[in-house]
């Protein structure tokens, strides 16, 4: 039996052959084809809108803004997220196909910003709702900072392994939040129902008995309240 002889590769054919792995090929194809879903609710989004102009030209990064979460693999949250908006944000994230990424842009998105101290309707950080890949602080961040965040995300994608991310996503459970911002395991939000188990109560009235509270209210006449 004669051995199989392979032809030798000359200089022309060797330059046209690429040896790589499936992970590197997948990561390379996703580096320059990020399709973001723009979730702008406040002034931080104005800074991102300036990237569309010719000065920064975010088209060179392959960014194609999409209006449907089913066609996007990146969601960029910019601005304040309230309790009423939270279920919609979680549903948009769940409708995005894998792999998907999140950039939290601005102080209001990351920590609640100036609303984090005495506002009962503001979410203190979007990472309590959806997992965040890149945090972009600022009030508001400059367009150069947004480009730097996109660059860091591209580097993170380049080092990613498909099996690890798939395993990590499969281990995650559905999450929900309360006004005290504690996470609990709940059923999927695809059902369209959202449970609000806790109502907000002012800390000043929590320790006051109902009898004392109504006595203090009855001591003020309606005439004084109106006038």
UniProtKB/Swiss-Prot annotation:
Cofactor note: Binds 1 [4Fe-4S] cluster.
Essential cofactor(s): [4Fe-4S] cluster
GO terms classed as biological process: aerobic respiration; electron transport coupled proton transport; photosynthesis, light reaction
UniProt name for this protein: NAD(P)H-quinone oxidoreductase subunit K, chloroplastic
Pfam hit, one: Oxidored_q6
Membrane topology, as annotated: Peripheral membrane protein
Function: NDH shuttles electrons from NAD(P)H:plastoquinone, via FMN and iron-sulfur (Fe-S) centers, to quinones in the photosynthetic chain and possibly in a chloroplast respiratory chain. The immediate electron acceptor for the enzyme in this species is believed to be plastoquinone. Couples the redox reaction to proton translocation, and thus conserves the redox energy in a proton gradient.
GO molecular function: 4 iron, 4 sulfur cluster binding; iron ion binding; NADH dehydrogenase (ubiquinone) activity; quinone binding
GO CC, any one term: respiratory chain complex I
Endpoints of the signal sequence: none
Subunit structure: NDH is composed of at least 16 different subunits, 5 of which are encoded in the nucleus.
Annotated source species: Zea mays (Maize)
Residues annotated as transmembrane: none
Family to which the UniProt record says this protein belongs: Belongs to the complex I 20 kDa subunit family.
E.C. designation(s): 7.1.1.-
Reactions the enzyme catalyzes: a plastoquinone + NADH + (n+1) H(+)(in) = a plastoquinol + NAD(+) + n H(+)(out); a plastoquinone + NADPH + (n+1) H(+)(in) = a plastoquinol + NADP(+) + n H(+)(out)
Binding-site positions, [4Fe-4S] cluster: 43-44, 108, 139
Lineage of the organism: Eukaryota, Viridiplantae, Streptophyta, Embryophyta, Tracheophyta
Gene of this entry: ndhK
Domain of life: Eukaryota
UniProt KW keywords: 4Fe-4S, Chloroplast, Iron, Iron-sulfur, Membrane, Metal-binding, NAD, NADP, Plastid, Plastoquinone, Quinone, Thylakoid, Translocase, Transport
Compartment list: Plastid, Chloroplast thylakoid membrane
